[in-house]
């Protein structure tokens, strides 16, 4: 493998957890089977010493560092990296949470090869595992009112059938997604009106509106530690998740799906109930 492979900018968003970010970078540098990449860390105005520590480590570990002046959320932070990648002619941007482990060392190579095989692929994601070894089902279908309310249980069963099937899907998981920069330039990156949660659905709509597709690469995977801890969320964390999810869902359902007020509220109420009983 050589620099003839498409160039990839790996973007890691940091907020307070510089230790996880450094560990993630070290894992990439020692395990990832891909030569033509750079790493960029965006610190989202952490309330601790993260920015100072990461800026120092950037020189020692050889990664790009950007200190954001405010914590404007997931989309804004990652857009800094995506736009840097576009401006500096990287062909792909790999959005990677710092609480992810590389289950397969060829995960990036495999996704890039899939992306190169089809010009209309704008976004790819691998299989996502939890710490107990179980895999998260892909989001194959575009959400409908039925799938977001009364039919949500049946939709989950249907999704589980495709865990091991590489295919076009509606959207992938935001903890690990490979973005084709040509497509991101066309759709103007992520919608920065979200803060946390729901960005993947909105990105899926932006890509589809320009006739790009999203691909689920089930043949390679990563482990997402947060997926394993969702059931242990504190009451305050659940309240925060509900609040931010509602903001994102309102934007998604109103401006991207054009649903009326009553339907939007029904969809959000169903989502809130699921979060509370988890």
Identify the residue ranges that each predicted region occupies.
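Active-site-adjacent helix/loop segment of glycosyltransferases
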Residues: 11, 205-278
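Glycine-rich, basic loop-to-helix element that forms the pyrophosphate-binding segment
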Residues: 67-88
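Short, well-formed alpha-helical segments that are part of the catalytic scaffolds
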Residues: 17-31
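Short, flexible, basic/aromatic active-site loop/helix in glycosyltransferases
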Residues: 143-170
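A short, conserved alpha-helix in the catalytic core of glycosyltransferases
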Residues: 170-221
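Short beta-strand-to-loop acidic/aromatic patch adjacent to the donor-nucleotide binding site
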Residues: 89-101
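Conserved donor NDP-sugar-binding/catalytic core segment of glycosyltransferases
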Residues: 103-138
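A conserved acidic beta->alpha catalytic loop
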Residues: 43-52, 70
């Amino acid at each position: 493998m050589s620099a003839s492979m498409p160039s990839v900018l790996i973007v890691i968003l940091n907020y307070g957890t510089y230790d996880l970010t450094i560990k993630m970078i070290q894992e990439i540098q020692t395990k990832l089977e891909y030569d033509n990449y750079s790493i960029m860390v965006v610190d989202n105005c952490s309330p601790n010493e993260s920015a100072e520590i990461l800026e120092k480590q950037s020189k020692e570990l050889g990664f790009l560092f950007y200190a954001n002046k405010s914590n404007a959320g997931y989309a804004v932070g990652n857009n800094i990296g995506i736009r840097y990648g576009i401006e500096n002619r990287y062909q792909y941007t790999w959005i990677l949470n710092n609480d992810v482990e590389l289950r397969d060392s060829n995960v990036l190579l495999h996704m890039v090869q899939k992306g190169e095989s089809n010009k209309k692929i704008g976004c790819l994601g691998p299989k996502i595992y939890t710490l107990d070894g179980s895999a998260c089902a892909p989001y194959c279908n575009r959400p409908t009112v039925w799938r977001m309310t009364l039919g949500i249980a049946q939709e989950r069963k249907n999704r589980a059938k495709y865990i091991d099937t590489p295919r076009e899907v509606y959207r992938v998981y935001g903890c690990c997604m490979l973005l084709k920069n040509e497509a991101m330039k066309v759709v103007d990156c992520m919608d920065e009106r979200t803060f946390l949660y729901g960005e993947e659905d909105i990105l899926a709509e932006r890509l589809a509106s320009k006739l790009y597709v999203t691909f689920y690469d089930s043949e390679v995977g990563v482990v997402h530690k947060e997926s394993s801890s969702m059931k242990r969320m504190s009451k305050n964390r659940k309240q925060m998740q509900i609040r931010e999810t509602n903001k994102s869902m309102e934007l998604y359902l109103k401006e991207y799906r054009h649903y009326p007020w009553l339907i939007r509220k029904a969809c959000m109420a169903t989502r809130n109930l699921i979060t509370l009983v988890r």
